[in-house]
Amino acid sequence: FKVKVSIELHPSVSRDIERTLHYGRRYFKVCPEFFIVKVPLTPEGYLAVRKLTQENIPINFTLGFSARQNYLAARLSNPDFVNVFLGRLNQVVIDHEAGSGDQVGEKVTLSTQSALIEAREKYKDVQSKLIGASIRNGAQVAFLAGLDVLTIPPKAIKEFQESGKATNEVISRLNEEIVPGINNSHPLAKRFPCLWEMPGQFISFVDDLMNENGLDEMQGNELVDFCRKHGMNLFHDFTDTELKQIYDHGKIPCLDNWSESIALDDLMTQSALQSFTKDQNA
């Protein structure tokens, strides 16, 4: 069809910078006119994407679940695209009976879009655009109007087309205060705000990281250590046993099984990565 398509690297290379670079370059050479290389969000992924982007290889940095993950990606790695898998964020609330789940993923997505717009305006080298991924219905298509990119399955676009919404009803909600469908009295409620919040402390952390010498030579473990020293819980050190537990459970984690010290965005990303690994191993 002569259209651009994202070609995802195998998850087995996701924690290896050199292999990510090797296969990223190799995939791109197959069809440079239309291939966008899809790289999963890991410490090594951030650093490999930084290099691939500098080589003008188009990148879709996937498996993002929060504004802060994607803001860091835009500043540090500057991929062409970042993602929020919003449907899964709504579902994790529903699965835990922590609320209706309405507009949870939408709030995260719009917060991410705002953060990226701010980054693009302040830092002229930042060009990353947001993909609203995991769209489930036509209402979400309308609610997220004005987003950089939406990936919409046929069922959802048909619902939108048949909704009868007038053109003047389809407006940008970037500056609106979105109230997510989370029961604030639920024991798990406090685990969700990290998905959409962008505190000044986090922006200062990213500023400090960008001022580090040798970013292009940084290794994944060094990025993890830098985050920990700055009090950022972006990358939990999952044991092999924990990874197997995530692998067996599926895309939506059972939050009751995991310490509150593990950030929800990190847990969702790892669950998505292990789920993709399982699919590839089938």
Where are these regions (language model features)?
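A residue-level signal for conserved active-site and pocket-lining positions in enzyme catalytic cores
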Residues: 7, 141, 276
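C-terminal extensions of enzymes
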Residues: 192-282
